[in-house]
């Protein structure tokens, strides 16, 4: 079972994404606070991080991403950034994120991106929802 950490300051989005990912067989941890991301990354050891670009509390998603990518212990964790702003190519490249998806997103698109980034052989099989 692949572990995914979801970071978003919108608790409704956190709850929806958590339910979706659990239905697809992922082990999920969520946090609404950017500053908690580092501690949860250490304790949960996620195989992928799904994170909002703009967080209202604590550190911004771009700052967190850049810090995680510059840390030798976390630099290889794929990070998919998401935002309601669709013109985010520059922002996610600057912070060295691995991918970007615009909100609102289709479940099939989200799962496809997750599968793509977990397909390096370290992730367990992803099951589909019936």
Q: Where are the model-predicted features located?
A:
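Charged docking surfaces used in two-component/phosphorelay signaling
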Residues: 15-23
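Short hydrophobic/Thr-rich beta-strand motif most characteristic of the beta2 strand and flanking loop
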Residues: 25-33, 40
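Short amphipathic alpha-helix used as the core "switch/output" element in two-component signaling
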Residues: 39, 62-75
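His-Asp phosphorelay/catalytic-motif detector in bacterial-type signaling
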Residues: 45-47, 73-78
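Active-site residues of response regulator receiver
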Residues: 52-53
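Alpha4 helix (beta4-alpha4-beta5 surface) of REC/receiver domains from two-component response regulators
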Residues: 59-63, 85-102, 108, 112-115
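Hydrophobic/aromatic residues positioned on beta-strands within the core alpha/beta folds
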Residues: 80-82
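The C-terminal output helix
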Residues: 115-130
């Amino acid at each position: 079972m692949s572990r995914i950490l979801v970071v978003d300051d919108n608790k409704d989005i956190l709850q929806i994404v958590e339910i979706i990912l659990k239905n697809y067989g992922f082990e999920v941890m969520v946090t609404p606070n950017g500053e908690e991301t580092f501690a949860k990354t250490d304790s949960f050891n996620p195989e992928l991080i799904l994170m909002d670009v703009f967080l209202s509390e604590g550190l911004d998603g771009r700052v967190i991403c850049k810090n995680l990518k510059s840390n030798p212990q976390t630099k290889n964790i794929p990070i998919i950034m998401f935002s309601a702003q669709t013109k985010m190519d520059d922002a996610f490249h600057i912070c060295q994120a691995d991918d970007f998806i615009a909100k609102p997103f289709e479940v099939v698109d989200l799962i496809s991106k997750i599968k793509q980034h977990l397909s390096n052989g370290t992730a367990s099989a992803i099951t589909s929802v019936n």
